[in-house]
Amino acid sequence: MRAKLQQLRKSNGYTQQTFSAAVGTSRSHYAQIETGDKQPALGLALRIKRVLNYYGDDIFDNTMPVGRK
C-alpha cells in the first residue's frame, strides 16, 4: 500500500474515480498504482504529483511491512 499517495488523494478531496479522471487514467489502473501492484509510467507519475501539488520523492514508496521468509 502506498499510504502517502492514498492520504494525499483523500486530503485533497478526491475519490479514486475522480482522481483517476483528473490524471488521465482508469480507476482500476490507478487503484493498482495506489496499492503498489503497478508502477506508474513517468508521465503519469508527474501528472499525479502535479495534481496533488506534491513534489517529494516518497509518494510512490510502498509502506507495507516486509514479512519474514
Task: Please state what every model-predicted region is.
Residues 1-11:
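A short, Lys/Arg-rich alpha-helix, primarily the initiator
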Residues 8, 22, 33, 62:
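Residues in the recognition helix of alpha-helical DNA-binding motifs
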Residues 9, 20, 49:
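The alpha-helix within a helix-turn-helix
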Residues 11, 43, 50, 57-69:
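Short, charged recognition helix plus adjacent turn
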Residues 13-32:
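Short alpha-helical DNA-recognition segment
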Residues 34, 44, 52:
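DNA major-groove recognition helix of helix-turn-helix
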